[in-house]
């Protein structure tokens, strides 16, 4: 799993490109995102965990989404970063642990995986 952070446009572009590359390699890709960007992605599974700024909804849905991806044998997961304040900090901590602290800075890397 990789958490992608940065400006929304750069994050979406990076996840879209990385998803295409992984799917061409035969990977089954899942994406965790906000409701507002859900329609921007094409992957095997795209799950919106809530609206931007609604960290409570993200916290409530995150575990179910991760379990769902696991049961579907998703081999590669990309997640948009969430705000790191309040409940959002707990969501980000869980995402970072699941990602093994693998973070991609969309703008700095041109969307290339670190």
Go through each PLM region and give its residues.
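A C-terminal functional module that forms or caps the active site or interfaces directly
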Residues: 2-100
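A glycine-rich helix N-cap at a beta->alpha junction
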Residues: 97-114
